[in-house]
């Protein structure tokens, strides 16, 4: 309506007409609007149904009905409508469900969503929601109101440090509040990690609490009072949400990465409050009312999303002695990140599927009296097979103590089928500990045993129950020891292990006295098929065993003593004969060197197995905080003593991408590669020597130039003042100094009678 048309109306009528025009048809639209949910409140859409042909349609419907009834959302077959693709002769991958009333439909939405159906995971939506989203008034290329489009930022290559030309490893040092990332060079030379500007990479935010690398070295985790930050990329920094990931969990104290770096567990001793009305938006968006009172948070790393939260175990964690009674890690990952499990001591094991975090088969595995469990690791071949859907089931081992007339028992179970693969009865058991070989080939159960009729159940002897996981029926070999075994360690990817033996465990502690141990090395005899002792070391002070990641070399360290800080470096295959296989087992076990690190609290090999680091942390009350780097032969390459030194951490490496054939080829041509590396090392050494010589010559030249300038200036000033250079007579000041040296050649003593 034009302004000319309004001239025929009065001013009041014109105002009413303008108001109606401004309002438009809003009141009419609201009056006659059709709600998308109206009439469809009881109808649901279930997506991700397997695609089948006509011959399997009825069977699929029956299985769907059984699954729905099993999880608590039963429905009649007449109420299931399966759309059909007539051209392809198959279903379309979704079904419509119509329940009798709204209450049952709402129950089905919450019950069925995320349910596993074979290899598929069902997704449930209300039919009205789908209608509403489909009819949203959004133009082409537009976004709904309230949505913000984020600019795409390309992520840096997260494993760029592996491309170092010299093949160097990295490590982190944490001193006071200063954190530095270093390259570990040849002969202990350290070079700080530098950014594109050539300056060392440093971040003041790293040193608030403590640091931890992820399992494959992709992320550096720093703990803060408000949560956890993961840093990645060439500079371990960058845009938030891309190279820097934040996980909000106030007062977090402990974290744990999954083996494949997909998930993260965080724990705080303070239960989560209700953040529904909290002023901090990050806390409101992260946690809901259902998370109140929980202490554990399971995260998806890539999306920084909370998968699930759990309360603390009140039975395992006391109010006054949290640190002494808490067992960490509480949650344990399967090797392929498929499952995460928690031991409910005395009741059972709760296994959760990832990423849905739903209980496996919607119920825990009930195991009366269960005390502990461990997942079986996998070789790279097994992991690839699992990813392709061809691998075997995951495996875990657990143990139950003696109860009434029942013996203690170790069980090996397959997951998800819950099939018991092997059981072994045990007697007079104080405690069991599981030690898996890194490839999952062997499982050693260290059984601490007490005397049969002893009143105290303190362990005085030990059995090693070794299960062979690659053989039929999982045979068990038993090694018995009259002494207590405080330490056990498998050789990575090998068939050898080392143990520490302690003769008497009940001796009173004497001030200044040190406990002596013996150390045994065992190896699988390929001819006899048994594990046999290949070397015995007696009267040793070492109580810690640390194998090289590549096997063969092992370090024996004395940690926790107030008077001894010895380190021994051993080679189990040392020989000058290339045909090592001809030698007897144990004949080549040789000590390469010894060392000492005063106040040592930790020891760790680098991923290459060429270097080993010992550190003394001020957190553990070490008298001389600092760190040292040694080569595998025991030669100390670097030592740094610093007050308030806290952490030394090697950066882990992911598994090699080389196949077995490629590795064999490299080993076959190792001499050629060694010659090339020796030439590069010599060139580097010469370059370093030439640089030092040039620097010294430059410094001497600068000194001589400075001295000449000052002499010329002094002579010029003396001449201007009319003074001549003083002549000093040094002849009169000369003194002759003589030194008499008496040498006793023989001494005779005569006695007069």
UniProtKB/Swiss-Prot annotation:
Alphabetized Pfam families for the sequence: eIF2A, RRM_1
PROSITE patterns assigned to the protein according to its UniProt record, in alphabetical order: RRM (PS50102)
Localization per Swiss-Prot or TrEMBL: Cytoplasm
Domain called RRM: residue spans: 42-129
WD repeat residue intervals: 142-185, 203-241, 321-362, 537-580, 595-640
GO biological process: formation of cytoplasmic translation initiation complex; translational initiation
Keywords: Coiled coil, Cytoplasm, Initiation factor, Protein biosynthesis, Repeat, RNA-binding, WD repeat
Coiled-coil stretches: 723-753
MF terms in GO: RNA binding; translation initiation factor activity; translation initiation factor binding
One GO term describing the cellular component: eukaryotic 43S preinitiation complex
Known role: RNA-binding component of the eukaryotic translation initiation factor 3 (eIF-3) complex, which is involved in protein synthesis of a specialized repertoire of mRNAs and, together with other initiation factors, stimulates binding of mRNA and methionyl-tRNAi to the 40S ribosome. The eIF-3 complex specifically targets and initiates translation of a subset of mRNAs involved in cell proliferation.
Family according to the record: Belongs to the eIF-3 subunit B family.
Assembly with partners or alone: Component of the eukaryotic translation initiation factor 3 (eIF-3) complex.
Protein name: Eukaryotic translation initiation factor 3 subunit B
Species of provenance: Cryptococcus neoformans var. neoformans serotype D (strain JEC21 / ATCC MYA-565)
